A protein has these predicted regions:
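A short SAM/SAH-binding and catalytic strip from SAM-dependent methyltransferases
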Residues: 172-186
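A short acidic, Gly/Pro-enriched loop at the edge of an enzyme's catalytic core
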Residues: 164-173
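Class I SAM-dependent methyltransferase SAM/SAH-binding core
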Residues: 106, 110-163
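Core SAM-dependent methyltransferase catalytic element
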Residues: 240-241, 245-257
Length: 257
């Protein structure tokens, strides 16, 4: 009988040790999660607000820059203006993209699809272009543009101000043309873009040159290379190259780490 009691006591002691180990591991796991979350929050720059601000801005500031107002769908004709071909040279832009046949691209702030259908031609039938916009009216115009060019290898996506609503690990190249400076929540939006990018995927910023006073665009709708790189440095992105072949815009390419 004594042996039976001793064996039971040993089993109880072992069970108690196992329970303690499990509890300690859970505690450590929770602490690590909290530390990681705290670290992420610490790294994310805070948004600030000012009542006295540029009339073309939102009064919301990020990384030392005022966020510009979004161009509404009422201004869609400006995206399709005939002179855009010479002012922005989309042909040169598309030749500069790290985009190949069969790949998946995302046109963020696709608008009327001015660039989307051209990108669809590059990736071909085996590729796909996600056309993301937060305005349903823009996506309606985009659908007409795609039909006009008999483009079928695309998917229109209604995004939100904090989320592209793109599938995770689905995109090779993300293109943002004259849109990033209007993101209401740039940090959250870029986190969403990074989730959608495949490992090693590329993000391409195209913005009017703030360094050039001759570029006839309102100041808040321009960005300097230094400002783009400053904000990209807050994210797990590696700078690849700056291409300055466009008449008025930077092409800044980054790679997901």
């Amino acid at each position: 009988m004594w042996g039976d009691h001793s064996t039971k006591r040993q089993h109880i002691d072992i069970l108690a040790v196992v329970m303690i180990v499990v509890a300690v591991r859970k505690f450590i796991f929770v602490c690590c999660c909290l530390l990681a979350a705290g670290s992420a929050l610490a790294q994310a720059p805070a948004y600030t607000y000012r009542d006295d601000h540029d009339p073309d801005g939102t009064g919301k500031f990020y990384a030392g820059r005022e966020i510009a107002q979004v161009m509404g769908h009422q201004g869609a004709d400006w995206l399709e203006r005939p002179e855009r071909q010479q002012e922005e040279r989309p042909d040169i832009l598309l030749q500069s993209l790290p985009l190949r046949p069969g790949e998946v691209a995302a046109d963020i702030g696709a608008g009327t699809g001015y660039l989307s259908w051209r990108m669809a031609q590059i990736v071909g039938d085996k590729g796909r272009v996600y056309c993301v916009d937060i305005q349903p009216e823009m996506l309606d115009l985009l659908a007409r543009k795609m039909a006009e060019h008999h483009t079928t290898n695309f998917q229109a996506v209604l995004g939100a101000v904090t989320d592209t609503h793109l599938p995770a690990d689905s995109v090779d190249v993300v293109l943002m043309v004259d849109v990033y400076h209007e993101f209401d929540h740039p940090y959250e939006m870029m986190q969403s873009i990074l989730r959608a990018l495949k490992p090693g995927g590329r993000v391409v910023w195209v913005e009017y040159r703030a360094e050039d006073p001759e570029v006839p665009i309102k100041p808040l709708h321009k960005m300097s290379e230094a400002q783009v790189r400053k904000e990209a440095a807050l994210l797990p992105l590696q700078f690849v190259e700056a291409i300055e072949t466009l008449p008025r815009q930077h092409i800044l390419i980054f790679k997901k780490k």
